[in-house]
């Protein structure tokens, strides 16, 4: 893993370089896309971005949990959670990148 975190500013800069919009327009475009995705998720809609992922809101029922320290049973209230499911295309890209990285890092044995 590289440890790098991609930020909104990084996305806007990438749009600026690749699309040719101004930096301001690029930042506004990134914000608009993120806002639209967030608003749809908050409304309970499924957001499917082909070749990337699906974001979905799920309702979880009330259930009984257990305090790990005391062993006491405690009720866990019902709630809504968001799930992220990577597409098969994204999963394949991640796997290929992982395999390529392993091959690149593999120590070479000198020819005898």
UniProtKB/Swiss-Prot annotation:
Among SMART domains, the record links this protein to: BHL (SM00411)
PROSITE patterns for the chain: HISTONE_LIKE (PS00045)
Question: Where does the chain cross the membrane?
Answer: none
Query: Key word Transcription present in the record?
Result: yes
Query: What does UniProt give as GO cellular component?
Result: cytosol
The record's annotation in InterPro entries points to: Hist_DNA-bd, Histone-like_DNA-bd_CS, IHF-like_DNA-bd_dom_sf, IHF_alpha
What keywords are assigned to this protein? Answer: DNA recombination, DNA-binding, Transcription, Transcription regulation, Translation regulation
Q: Which GO terms fall under molecular function for this chain's record? A: DNA binding; structural constituent of chromatin
SUPFAM superfamilies reported in the protein's UniProt record: IHF-like DNA-binding proteins
From the UniProt record, give one GO term of the biological process aspect: DNA recombination
PANTHER family xrefs: DNA-BINDING PROTEIN HU, INTEGRATION HOST FACTOR SUBUNIT ALPHA
What assembly does the database describe for this protein?
Answer: Heterodimer of an alpha and a beta chain.
- Family membership noted in the UniProt record: Belongs to the bacterial histone-like protein family.
Its biological purpose is as follows: This protein is one of the two subunits of integration host factor, a specific DNA-binding protein that functions in genetic recombination as well as in transcriptional and translational control.
Protein name per Swiss-Prot or TrEMBL: Integration host factor subunit alpha
- Species name: Rhizobium leguminosarum bv. trifolii (strain WSM2304)
């Amino acid at each position: 893993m590289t440890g790098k975190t991609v930020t909104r500013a990084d996305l806007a800069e990438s749009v600026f370089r690749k699309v040719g919009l101004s930096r301001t327009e690029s930042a506004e475009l990134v914000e608009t896309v993120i806002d639209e995705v967030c608003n749809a998720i908050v409304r309970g809609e499924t957001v499917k971005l082909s070749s990337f992922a699906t974001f979905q809101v799920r309702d979880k029922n009330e259930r009984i949990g257990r305090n790990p320290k005391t062993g006491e049973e405690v009720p866990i209230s019902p709630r809504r959670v968001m799930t992220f499911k990577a597409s098969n295309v994204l999963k394949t890209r991640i796997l290929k990148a992982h395999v390529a990285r392993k091959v690149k890092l593999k120590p070479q044995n000198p020819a005898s």
